[in-house]
């Protein structure tokens, strides 16, 4: 098996700065994503119990079977 000489890598100060800037940008992006998630969590904890119930029912697909205008006790079209 043949061996070849290792490739020499030269890193300049500009390369280091570019790397540091990229790492800083990634850190800031992840922090902003974390902050957005925390804000969404805070919003959901501030909702009233009734609003939470409505949101939950919409999320899992529960719908009201009778429209209030069709309910017999409210004088809707379904009267006999």
UniProtKB/Swiss-Prot annotation:
Keyword set, alphabetical order: Acetylation, Chaperone, Ubl conjugation pathway
Chaperone recorded as keyword: yes
Pfam family, any one: ANAPC_CDC26
Single biological process term from Gene Ontology: anaphase-promoting complex-dependent catabolic process
Keyword match Nucleus: no
Positions with biased composition (Basic and acidic residues): 37-54
Residues recorded with modification N-acetylmethionine: 1
Coiled-coil ranges (or none): none
Top-level division of the source organism's lineage: Eukaryota
Subunit structure, interactors included: The APC/C is composed of at least 13 subunits: apc1, apc2, nuc2, apc4, apc5, cut9, apc8, apc10, apc11, hcn1, apc13, apc14 and apc15. Interacts directly (via N-terminus) with cut9.
Protein name according to UniProt: Anaphase-promoting complex subunit hcn1
Gene source species: Schizosaccharomyces pombe (strain 972 / ATCC 24843) (Fission yeast)
Taxonomic classification: Eukaryota, Fungi, Dikarya, Ascomycota, Taphrinomycotina
